[in-house]
């Protein structure tokens, strides 16, 4: 008799064991091609990530892999074990990049199940994981927590796992690669973007004027390249019946990357490193053809070291209407959507807190 | 008097000489960018091709270029001399990858005309070629035969060829790079995909659940990158009048790559090398916007060496309907379409036999 | 009180100072990924730019970055300071590539304001700049002049510039990398494309038969990768109100690249280097979905050195109708559109003069 199998991956609520660590099976060498495909969608003005000269001028041995690419790889690698059945991605917290990853490094990721609970309606649950991305030497290059909404029960057709004999350190270490620990040497060049640490004051609001329309092919290429295996992003047949939008939806990590890139000429042009992301959420979904825009609010500014300081921004991404127009209409752009009693901004697609190490002029 | 030329390439039936070898003019260094663009469309779970760590753990000096990319380059390089006038690509046979190609290698290809004959209607013909892809040292990295349907007569505007003083070895050598000849060392990592050699039994059918919708830009980018010069894939003006579909059609080598990638988490996650493809055909064409799915049937399993064995799959690719649904409707999925008296599966876009070297658990 | 800023970049007519040099802030390492993305849109037959073997055979140390990619980077890097507010790109002149750029080089660009003047209607002006692209050692790898049509007045929300303490040499040096100065060694291979220096005669017209349809994602990816920051290419919301086409328009440097690539099998298959482009203009715009075609006319042929000679082509790009059909209808294809009293070719999207160093058979 013919044995017909239809393997499915990801987990439903009862498939998760609190305390378990899943070693995600993907094993990928990051190369210059990935960097270019990332740069072809996300026009990031932060010099360290784009220029070997700029990177070496701050003490790194080469141009590092963009932290946002690492975050996207971490999320995507984890889909196979964590969220391939998920209904929604709910939150990012405590995202950090404690060491530089370079092209040529080979990456893996694992996820620790921190918690899980059914939602009050009882027909689904929230799972809370911490994902860590390490290179071929076991060096931690990205760590973050996220929450996802998953269906109840179990995935019937899930093949038995290969052994997951991995452990995660209890708390990930600092927020800055060790190469960037000392005082910051002066910039390697004349000219450059205008927005140094000195240019920001707490309370400043910046509406970033240029938007980016999302291409149908490009978001699928990125999801595929990242090894994101959720059919919602690339399988139109699945999406017609199973997507809230009745069509393919852009992977949230890409939406976040677009919004950070759109803000970058105004906020990160004198940037040196991403000190972390926190309190991130996706209030609504994005489709191919949507145009994304960004706005930033300065919520903290601190001296960090000789030649540089940190600035913390609250970043908001919206679709199809420039944020300046929304502010003119009185939109409450920077209050988190979750828990808003009124004034929900239906155009909002992402909100997150980002801390950057920026060069100082003074 | 003005001399107006309108050069055209490829060959019609009378342009082919049996026994001739055409040295295709393309001369291309394969780089990490090509690997990434390939990985951005084809999410392949086979670790050797994606991870330098995994590749070195089996004895290769670096992550090799995906065999499927080599096959695609070979087909595409040959279009200029062989199939730029072709009406259809009919068959692939005896595809093998006897040596590893690495990023940085520079590739050329040549095609030997094995045979040609008019079809019975007399208004077209079938040409049968063997194409070989070699690196800068003349090392054979890919060999295959294919058949194409071409118009009768000659291409009037074809410029005279540069000399083709190349020879092909009579029969291509083995199916495995010499670095992989010895016993297979244990895997380099904990965890990984579940489907080892031990998990397959002859007769097993696997329907791969996730599909992939094809982007308009991405399939044109790949055809262009591969140096496929047939206007059917990228020239909408040509295609409106000359394509069977009245629009651009996705290059068949890409369709094959999508279908193999869609099957890969369930069949190739413990894969080490592609031992060959055979008896491949494209029963119908694929357009941008179509969603591809795959199904596999295990047709042979053999012990090959210490730590690994070979499994031979019959793979089928279909469009816009998941294979599980087709099987539920009683579709005869795994019988070749050519020569079927009845029960033709109109959704089928590719069928091929693939042999993989897979790790064993036992 | 909240300070809301909406920074805008580029310059309007009164923002330009004749004699000023703007050091563009982008600082980008060119990598194999950029080369592959470029090759995935522009199928260029010129061997030097695609093959390490071919490049080394003429004395270069590696496969160089395509000159057309350098020109595109130069134009795009300058948008932030020069043309982000521009209404139209009017002309390219004196484009040259005096040194080879290799993958791994880090590029910057600067623009010297050569002149500016209001147009007669008084509601806009023309700015004329010379842009230079240099590598990490200050070596000039691309120089060109261009003219753009800009609005009158000033950009109110433009942040104050970082200091631009850069100087440009008065006149860029030669047209050939020093590695290519000596006699040309024979080709590294048997076979290759047919069109050597010997095959062209002044007055020859060549209609290139295969067209290329432009993908929506791919042209946005390229504009983003190049760091072109004009919203016209990627921001559909902006374009609906501010584009002449009421939708996104393809960056002209890409249109030029497509047209040169479409001509390349017939003109550049025996090419060694681009000796320069001149008298270039874009008579009309191109949108995603348009199909581009090319035609060439030989306007000069000279002996240049042992083994090679130069050929100068007048190249024309048209959209959605093959040039052979336009010629059959009596179109005056090779007369520049600007200043034509009658017989304007409305399908024409680019025209430019290109000089190539080509191998000789004799």
Task: Describe each region flagged by the PLM.
Chain A
Residues 1-18, 101-185, 288-290, 295-362:
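HotDog/MaoC-like acyl-thioester-processing domains
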Residues 1-92, 142, 153-275, 333-351, ...:
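Hot-dog-fold acyl-thioester-processing enzymes
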Residues 38, 92, 107-111, 131, ...:
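Short, structured motif recognition centered on aromatic/hydrophobic residues
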Residues 65-66, 98-103, 250-251, 285-288:
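Short, low-complexity cationic-aromatic patches
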Residues 91-99, 114, 273-286, 299:
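A cross-kingdom feature marking solvent-exposed beta-strand/loop segments within repeated
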